[in-house]
């Protein structure tokens, strides 16, 4: 009986796949020390980011069942 591939739990918590196969992630720098950051910068950081196609291949190896 073949063993299953393991999912990297750290990648599972950080990335999620869309229906079209793109990878979404939450942007960094929005946890603390927010007073010196402008409202525009904080507003743009609230939006989710998309990875490029080169990085998607690497993430798919970390998340085989994603």
Curated annotation (Swiss-Prot):
Any single GO CC term annotated in Swiss-Prot or TrEMBL for this entry: cytosolic large ribosomal subunit
Q: Name one GO biological process term.
A: translation
Where does the source fall among the domains of life? Answer: Bacteria
Tell me which UniProt keywords the record has, alphabetically. Ribonucleoprotein, Ribosomal protein
The record's section on NCBIfam families has: rpmI_bact (TIGR00001)
* Cited HAMAP family: Ribosomal_bL35
Which protein are we looking at? Large ribosomal subunit protein bL35
């Amino acid at each position: 009986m073949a063993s299953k591939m393991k999912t990297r739990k750290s990648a599972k918590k950080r990335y999620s796949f869309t229906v079209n196969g793109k990878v979404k992630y939450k942007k960094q720098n929005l946890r603390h020390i927010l007073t010196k950051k402008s409202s525009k910068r904080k507003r743009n950081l609230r939006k989710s980011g998309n990875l490029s196609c080169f990085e998607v291949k690497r993430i798919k190896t970390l998340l085989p069942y994603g």
